């Protein structure tokens, strides 16, 4: 019984994403970005067919497994654009450090101003790393792993929805700058959006995602000790 459910789950998810890509291409908007638009489609499909979330989990596990080869595949555009990346390494590293630290400190300060609990402050501060890293980092900074993972997912989705739109609004067209911003702030989802924009954007976003996670993991505990 599991195999048909897995095939159905993967098919529905892939179909919802492809449909969302078509809608986003014809009607570009922050609300038609594939990740945001496809999520309710999958939920509606599960509700309509009466499939429980527990039954959908094996299909989700298959797609999560495929993230591994997809991540390794980022090495291809990275290799093709290696010379450009090396030539712009210094300003890119400066921008990455500024983006990672500013989003960490700004999120923590805002959460503290709203009188949120220290656990929530710590969890929201590390929102711009990937979910697996956030889950491991949360206990170190006295945050909640479940909350941290939720904030990571929300950050990625909001970044993909609003990031390209805001960059277009303020006239940021340079592929390197766009990829750096998406990868630093919106991690995996931002990298997927960057790959959709272009090969160079995807290569830069992939590097930015990894380095931002390392920097946040190293600097996060110290920065939060100053805020909390």
Residue ranges and their predicted role:
Residues 1-13, 57-72, 117-126, 146-154, ...:
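Structural signature of hydrophobic alpha-helical transmembrane segments
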Residues 2-13, 17-79, 84-95, 99:
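Helical membrane-embedded segments and adjacent short helical loop/helix-boundary regions
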Residues 28-29, 51, 79-90, 114-119, ...:
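Juxtamembrane helix-boundary/capping and inter-helix hinge elements in multi-pass membrane proteins
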Residues 36-48, 68-73, 94-107, 125-135, ...:
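Small-residue-rich segments of transmembrane alpha-helices in multi-pass membrane proteins
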Residues 120-147, 151-155, 173-211:
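Alpha-helical membrane segments and immediately flanking helix-loop junctions
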Residues 218-228:
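Juxtamembrane boundary at the C-terminal end of a transmembrane helix
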């Amino acid at each position: 019984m599991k195999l048909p459910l897995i095939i159905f789950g993967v098919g529905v998810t892939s179909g919802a994403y492809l449909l969302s890509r078509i809608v986003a291409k014809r009607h570009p908007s922050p609300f038609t970005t594939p990740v945001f638009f496809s999520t309710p489609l999958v939920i509606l499909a599960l509700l309509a067919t009466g499939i429980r979330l527990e039954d959908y989990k094996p299909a989700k596990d298959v797609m999560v497994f495929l993230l591994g080869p997809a991540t390794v595949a980022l090495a291809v555009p990275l290799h093709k654009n290696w010379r450009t990346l090396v030539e712009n390494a210094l300003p890119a590293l400066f921008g990455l450090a500024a983006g990672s630290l500013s989003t960490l400190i700004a999120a923590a300060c805002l959460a503290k101003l709203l009188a949120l609990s220290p656990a929530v402050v710590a969890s929201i501060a590390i929102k711009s790393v990937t979910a697996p890293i956030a889950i491991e980092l949360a206990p170190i900074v006295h945050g909640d792993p479940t909350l941290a993972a939720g904030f990571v997912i929300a950050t990625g989705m909001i970044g993909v929805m609003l990031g390209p739109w805001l960059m277009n609004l303020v006239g940021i067209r340079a592929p390197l700058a766009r990829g750096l911003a998406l990868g630093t702030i919106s991690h995996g989802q931002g990298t997927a959006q960057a790959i959709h924009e272009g090969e160079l954007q995807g290569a830069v976003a992939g590097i930015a995602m990894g380095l931002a996670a390392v920097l946040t993991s190293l600097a996060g505990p110290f920065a939060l000790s100053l805020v909390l």
